[in-house]
């Protein structure tokens, strides 16, 4: 039984939404990659920063909506965002987090109970895992889900528009498709601007500064067949690169590929 199927079964037995059941599983240390888990529900990237930087980061997201589409934001010090889910606790409901100090990643805890501060503001940003359901429903293969690994992600030479201390390169996620499939993937994902929308680049990874597609900066490599082209989407891991470059004294993000699963429905984010 797959992780997603197990979550669906547990949720049905407990009378919970699959998204809620997944969060409970992660809260108690069960599970790993969230790809393909609780299908139909929106997943989000996390950027958690001190309140004094929140205004500049909010503007950074507004200036860079492709990699940083905001789907939720907390009040300072509040680990709950009720609009995103019942019993959703930012401190415990993600499989793994990253703690940053002065731009360096210093720890990868499975909860934030020992790290939480009263001035922290949480930004939840749209994730491409949300549109993968629509791709699969149309019969398109998702390689990293087929292989049970994390989606490959790469730093690029595409510069984000800066705001205050926040500046740096866009990070992209990659999924390989045959050319006809790639065209269909563009058509489908254009409907989901709240979770990165259409791709930012197709083929020729060197044109966006990717030297070796077999060596992603985040996530896991997946094979690209001779009759396939790599398709790249703006990625919500971009804030990790930006926060690192800003050298904030303290910040928290999710570990790449290990997302927050919300109670929002993917279908409700579609614009067409």
From Swiss-Prot:
<keyword id="KW-0456">Lyase</keyword>
<dbReference type="InterPro" id="IPR038021">
    <property type="entry name" value="Putative_hydro-lyase"/>
</dbReference>
<dbReference type="Pfam" id="PF07286">
    <property type="entry name" value="D-Glu_cyclase"/>
</dbReference>
<dbReference type="InterPro" id="IPR009906">
    <property type="entry name" value="D-Glu_cyclase"/>
</dbReference>
<comment type="similarity">
    <text>Belongs to the D-glutamate cyclase family.</text>
</comment>
<dbReference type="GO" id="GO:0016829">
    <property type="term" value="F:lyase activity"/>
</dbReference>
<protein>
    <recommendedName>
        <fullName>Putative hydro-lyase BBta_2883</fullName>
        <ecNumber>4.2.1.-</ecNumber>
    </recommendedName>
</protein>
<dbReference type="InterPro" id="IPR016938">
    <property type="entry name" value="UPF0317"/>
</dbReference>
